[in-house]
Every structure is written in structure tokens, then in C-alpha cells.
């Protein structure tokens, strides 16, 4: 332990840290050079004042540099949310990932266990028979053979072991709730990323731009979820060509009906997995339409679809042809053989 972080704790409470100062601070955290009290002090100073784009970008760049990296195919996309919306929905981003992969777009999905629902991405995948506790080489093999791979955050970010206990003791949101979607170990350049607050979508888009993303949609559902909503309009900050455009998106713009929010509320991992299987078998309803909407957006971000309506058509074919379901079966086989 050292006192190198100490001066920056007081600074962080009174003014934004520069990119260089923030990088130094997070180097101290990730190298285990700070005491738990110092870590907590820095995290709460940032949270109380409000983190800046430079601070997000600095923390994300240090975290990316220290992760166990994965080589992904060209054009790979991540489909992920911050979690923390407290809405307990069915596993929409997870199902979306398989639908998009079934449409021929490589998906390098970064995720963890439950945060905002009773069943996070890793919980749902485990319930469906996939082994999520695999390392970078196995994930790369999955991406090459199946066109989809799941990167369990703790398996790829060993430096987080230093801050994990502090986060648990604080018991409140910190900058790390935002960093997950910004620190994909495969370094993908395209993202469909949901945020638990509409106030985060533009800053997160600015961070992804600073970190080299080519095209990304940062979204917040009008129903309060960290994905495009099927029950209301959603806010979007779209990054493309270094420019950010903000707009609202309604399900009907994609040719989809509006459904009551209650129809996408999830349950236990087993119940969510059952709904997931039914969706892959073609069951209609709010869950499928929510997945189609998010898949359509991902296909636009991946340049696989020209617009949302075409994206819905492609995503529908991925489900009804059995392509999305086949991806689940293949990934289950590959991860359990690892």
C-alpha cells in the first residue's frame, strides 16, 4: 500500500480530475496500491460531485489495458446494458444477442450475473446449459465457430478483485456500474448499450467515441429500462463518424406494436429461461417484439440492416428459421467442451 492516491481524493471532491489524474488514480486502484478507505473515498468523491467524460474515459482505458483480451472477428458487436434499472425484466439483451448472431453478425457479449433483474445475462445462460466461466482462448474459439461468445466480466478483469469488496461494502452505485459496458475485453468498435438513466446516454456515447468506437447506440427506455422499450418511446444517443445525434424512438417506427410493460417482467432464472426457449421457438408477444426491436437496432449499428423495419424483418427470420436457437445449442456445446 502507498499514499500516492491520497492527494487526489480531496481534489476529486472539489473539481473534475484531468484525464491524466484520473488514469493515475485508477492505476492505483487496479494495482492494489490503495487502502479500502482510500478506494471508497475516491469512489464516493466522484459519485457525489458527478463523474465527467474524462474520468469515465480514463477509468475505462485503464481497465481495458489490464483486462484479459479476446480477439473477435471484424465487425463484432456488443449488446449490453449497465443493469441497475431495478425493473426485473426478462433477459432482453441476452436473447437479442442470439437473434443478432443468428442473422450473421458476430456478437462478443460482455456481461455478469444479476444486477437489475432476478436473472442477469450469466444467470440466464447458465440456466440454459451454457458454461460462462471460460477464459479468453475458449471465448475466441466460440466466436470463430459459433459467431457468438460470452465474456464473463470476472474472468476477464482480474484487477477488479481489488475494488470488488469495497463496492460491496459501499452498497451504492459508483463509476463501476457504468464501466462494464465500456470495457468489452474484445475491444469491439460497435455497441448497442443500455443505460439505467437517460442522463448517461450522451456521456457514455462521448466516452465510446473517445475510446475509438465507430458506431454505437446508447439507449434508455421510456419505461425506465436499460434497453429500447416496447411499452414506450426510448431515448437514443447515436454515435457515428465521430458525431452524436440524439433522438426519441417509438416501437411503431420499427413496425412493432406497443405492449404493456407488465408483459416483459421476468421471474426466476428458470422462469426466464423457459420464456427464452419459447421465444426461440417462435412464440409471439411482448417479449419477442421487445427482442425484435433491440435486435433491429443492433443490426442497424452493425450495418446489417439499412433501417429498423429491415432490421425487424432480418431478426424475425433469425428466430423463425431456427438460426437463433441453433446458436444457443452450438454455444452450449462449445462452452461445455472447453
Curated annotation (Swiss-Prot):
Residues where Mg(2+) 2 binds: 226-227
Keywords: Amino-acid biosynthesis, Aromatic amino acid biosynthesis, Glycosyltransferase, Magnesium, Metal-binding, Transferase, Tryptophan biosynthesis
Enzyme class: transferase
Binding site for Mg(2+) 1: 93, 227
Positions bound to anthranilate 2: 167
Pathway where it operates: Amino-acid biosynthesis; L-tryptophan biosynthesis; L-tryptophan from chorismate: step 2/5
UniProt superkingdom: Bacteria
Subunit annotation: Homodimer.
Protein name, UniProt field: Anthranilate phosphoribosyltransferase
